[in-house]
Amino acid sequence: MSSHNLVTLVSWLAGDFSNREQAWDAPAFFSHIRLCMRPLPWQVFEGYGLYSEQADDYDWAHPYRIVVLNLVEQPDGIIECRNYALKDTAPYLGAAREAERARLHRLTPEQLEPLPGCTFLFKREGSLFRGRVRPGKGCRVFRKGRDTYLDGEATVSADYYKSIDRGRDLESDEQVWGSVSGPFHFTKQVDFAPEVLALARP
């Protein structure tokens, strides 16, 4: 049986988010980004999953980052947010915003590539969940001609999602890419939590 904290975190993440206010206030530092996380059918993971698309607001129909998430609670209460890449993203572009989620019902585990080093670990802290990528420099990203690792953090509440991704040099830990102006602050525009609560479990 799923715990209250697990269901709460998945429900809070399930939504269509925008950092519009932040981008308007500081356009030199923050692009206007849309982030949409849509609940997956239970059978994809035999558990809670989300299909996530991130895109520039001016071109939200063509996301530049697609990831599939599987959230699993551990005995110590830590919630693992396991990351997967789609082997072929083309059949699913734009699927996060389809009213009936028809294409997401065709998703199978065989279409996914696990990214084990990129798992986020979330812990409940009062009215928030705070998470960061699993320690160990395991989430590798080749960018700007260099091998880097992801140093990522996130904070989740009922109505916002804050995240900061920084790429660091494998040897020196120097920041190579990512935000130098603090986290992106996304507010929830559309709530998909009812879809989480309505998931059909076997």
Swiss-Prot record:
Q: Which InterPro entries match?
A: CpcT/CpeT (IPR010404), CpcT/CpeT_sf (IPR038672)
Q: Which UniProt keywords apply?
A: Lyase
Question: Known CDD domains for this protein?
Answer: CpcT (cd16338)
Which GO MF terms does the UniProt record name?
lyase activity
Q: One Pfam family, please name it.
A: CpeT
Assigned EC number: 4.-.-.-
Top-tier EC class: lyase
PANTHER family xrefs: CHROMOPHORE LYASE CRL, CHLOROPLASTIC
Purpose of the protein: Covalently attaches a chromophore to Cys residue(s) of phycobiliproteins.
Task: Identify its protein family.
Answer: Belongs to the CpcT/CpeT biliprotein lyase family.
Task: Write down what this protein is called.
Answer: Chromophore lyase CpcT/CpeT 2
Question: Which organism's genome codes for this protein?
Answer: Gloeobacter violaceus (strain ATCC 29082 / PCC 7421)
